[in-house]
């Protein structure tokens, strides 16, 4: 029988639990500047137990997302493969801790602490967008932790497709929900305010999943200040010279411009065993747009 387990990790003394009060999430000092090692923060995760001895599947969401983005595919793949499946909230997202450091080095360090702690290494890392780049960096830095890698609709190559992200953050910051009496009312108001900037209803719905009630107030659980301050880091992959020689799949949406066939030569420079596969009729959120095709591609790569 499949069973969800949910837990927190607190690798450093002094980072205490915050229950569900997102406004009081602990702030970890930034320490990835000047070459010092980033300090990991407590991450929220869900682990779906499995009986197979095969490497666990670890899902990393994209910018503005959360671990819940993968609930359906995680449960389905756990049932189909018998593997353990982990979904994780990145720092400054979902129910994970907030920190002023939003670098890929910091997000990789978070996982370098969490995954061995849970006994899930080596694992199959499956990352979408920002999560894909985090997975790529972790594989380059600590290849012994990654049995194989799947990057979903992202590569290390910079694209112009993310140029609207600053507008998303500005629009979310501008929403005033002080007079709203219910979460449904706050979401309706926020949707109306965001519509003038974000025409895509699916993107607005993704952003609205981050609207929560804290102490009678409606707030964004995302750390928008950290995202805004370090968006340039999120949109740019760190310069690396290492290579990851494990099996690697770059899975792109056929209707997306984030990952293109022209990126393949640069991808192969860092990931010499990389394959590229296209999911037709899928946009950037491949796992949401075409979940069955997405899971079929994952299963084929695992075979």
UniProtKB/Swiss-Prot annotation:
Quaternary assembly: Interacts with OGDH and DLST; this interaction maintains the functional lipoylation of the 2-oxoglutarate dehydrogenase complex.
Family: Belongs to the AB hydrolase superfamily.
SUPFAM superfamilies: alpha/beta-Hydrolases (SSF53474)
Entry keyword annotation includes Hydrolase: yes
Post-translational modification summary for this protein: Phosphorylated.
Principal location class: mitochondrion
Gene3D superfamilies: alpha/beta hydrolase
Protein name in UniProt: sn-1-specific diacylglycerol lipase ABHD11
Classification via Pfam families: Abhydrolase_1
GO CC entries: mitochondrial matrix; mitochondrion; oxoglutarate dehydrogenase complex
Organism from which the protein derives: Bos taurus
Example GO biological process: lipid metabolic process
Coiled-coil parts of chain: none
Enzyme Commission code: 3.1.1.116
PANTHER family named in the record: PROTEIN ABHD11 (PTHR46118:SF4)
Role of this protein: Catalyzes the hydrolysis of diacylglycerol in vitro and may function as a key regulator in lipid metabolism, namely by regulating the intracellular levels of diacylglycerol. 1,2-diacyl-sn-glycerols are the preferred substrate over 1,3-diacyl-sn-glycerols. The enzyme hydrolyzes stearate in preference to palmitate from the sn-1 position of 1,2-diacyl-sn-glycerols. Maintains the functional lipoylation of the 2-oxoglutarate dehydrogenase complex (OGDHc) through its interaction with the OGDHc by preventing the formation of lipoyl adducts.
Keyword entries, A-Z: Hydrolase, Mitochondrion, Transit peptide
Localization (cell): Mitochondrion; Mitochondrion matrix
Active site: 129, 225, 284
Limits of the AB hydrolase-1 domain: 55-290
The reaction(s) this protein catalyses: a 1,3-diacyl-sn-glycerol + H2O = a 1-acyl-sn-glycerol + a fatty acid + H(+); 1-octadecanoyl-2-(9Z-octadecenoyl)-sn-glycerol + H2O = 2-(9Z-octadecenoyl)-glycerol + octadecanoate + H(+); 1-octadecanoyl-2-(4Z,7Z,10Z,13Z,16Z,19Z-docosahexaenoyl)-sn-glycerol + H2O = 2-(4Z,7Z,10Z,13Z,16Z,19Z-docosahexaenoyl)-glycerol + octadecanoate + H(+); a 1,2-diacyl-sn-glycerol + H2O = a 2-acylglycerol + a fatty acid + H(+)
Modified residues (N6-succinyllysine): 75
UniProt activity-regulation remark: The diacylglycerol lipase activity can be modulated by phosphorylation by cAMP-dependent protein kinase.
Span of chain positions assigned to the transit peptide in the UniProt entry: 1-22
